[in-house]
């Protein structure tokens, strides 16, 4: 009687995919009776293969869900905003960027940013209807501090985000009213927080306009020049660029949890709904 755990009498076979009727060369073990040496079993590669999951934004069917990446969409937005700046102020545009704004309630919002020689423009652009919905103008001479760093949250916060961003201050947060601080739709917040757009790696074009480093390289000199040329209260100011954690004061975070996971802040194809 053979002992328990003995594998005598068993023959190793390789797994084959369904429909493969031809035996492979490794299906049978070499069994030469005259060979005095122990039988050698060659190692076979596993039937399942482990591969690194690719960046989802490299896949066209995912990137096309974002209307900003569709052919001609970002170019149309830039031309619209160029025309608006030419008609209203005539200022010189330093560059365009497509970034994600994170509001004081941790909600993500897709935004186009323009830096001119005097102004930072934050545009809410509808990439579906190809029209500017909202435009916020911030004088560069009013910006006095920029913070770069990782996002941090209160210890009890339920909806935390990873990654890094930047925050631009043109007013004191201490002077912000309690009402505007707790109002998720308030437009009186004296700062703006940004991070890179999720479509950054879609193409070389989007890699260029979605990078925070590229945005900073144009924004900082423009602010410094605006301070030098300012004739008002901003004259003589010095811009502070700090590396420190960026605090987002959200505690429950249910609203941002639902909105961010469903990408409600982006012009996105939501799919068809039928019966």
Curated annotation (Swiss-Prot):
GO terms for cellular component: cytoplasm. Keywords: Cytoplasm. Pfam families: hSac2. The keyword Cytoplasm applies. PROSITE patterns: HSAC2. Its main location: cytoplasm. Coiled coil: none annotated. Residues 68-240 form the hSac2 domain. InterPro entries: hSac2 (IPR034753), Inositol_phosphatase (IPR022158), TPRG1-like (IPR040242). Residues 41-53 have a biased composition (Polar residues). It is found in: Cytoplasm. Residues 1-54 are annotated as: Disordered. Expressed in the epidermal layer of the skin. Belongs to the TPRG1 family. This is Tumor protein p63-regulated gene 1 protein. The lineage of its organism: Eukaryota, Metazoa, Chordata, Craniata, Vertebrata. The gene is TPRG1.
């Amino acid at each position: 009687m053979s002992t328990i755990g003995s594998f005598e009498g068993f023959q190793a076979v390789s797994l084959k995919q369904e429909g493969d009727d031809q035996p492979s060369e490794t299906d049978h073990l070499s069994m030469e009776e005259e060979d005095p040496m122990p039988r050698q079993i060659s190692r076979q590669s596993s039937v399942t293969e482990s591969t690194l999951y690719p960046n989802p934004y490299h896949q066209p069917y995912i990137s096309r869900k974002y209307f900003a990446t569709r052919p001609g969409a970002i170019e149309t937005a830039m031309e619209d905003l160029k025309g608006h700046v030419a008609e209203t102020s005539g200022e010189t545009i330093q560059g365009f960027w497509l970034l994600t704004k994170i509001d004081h309630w941790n909600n993500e919002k897709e935004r186009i940013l323009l830096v001119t020689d005097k102004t930072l423009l934050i545009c809410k652009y509808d990439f579906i209807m190809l029209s500017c919905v909202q435009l916020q103008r911030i004088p560069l001479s009013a910006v006095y501090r920029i913070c770069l760093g990782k996002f941090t949250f209160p210890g009890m916060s339920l909806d935390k985000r990873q990654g890094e961003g930047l925050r631009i201050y043109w007013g004191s947060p201490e002077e912000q009213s309690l009402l505007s601080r707790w109002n998720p739709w308030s437009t009186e917040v004296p700062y703006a927080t940004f991070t890179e757009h999720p479509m950054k790696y879609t193409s070389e074009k989007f890699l260029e306009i979605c990078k925070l480093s590229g945005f900073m390289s144009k924004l900082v000199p423009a602010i410094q020049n605006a301070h030098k040329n300012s004739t008002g209260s901003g004259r003589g100011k010095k811009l502070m660029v700090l590396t420190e954690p960026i605090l987002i004061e959200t505690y429950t975070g249910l609203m941002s949890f639902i909105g961010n996971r469903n990408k409600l802040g982006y012009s996105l194809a939501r799919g068809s709904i039928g019966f």
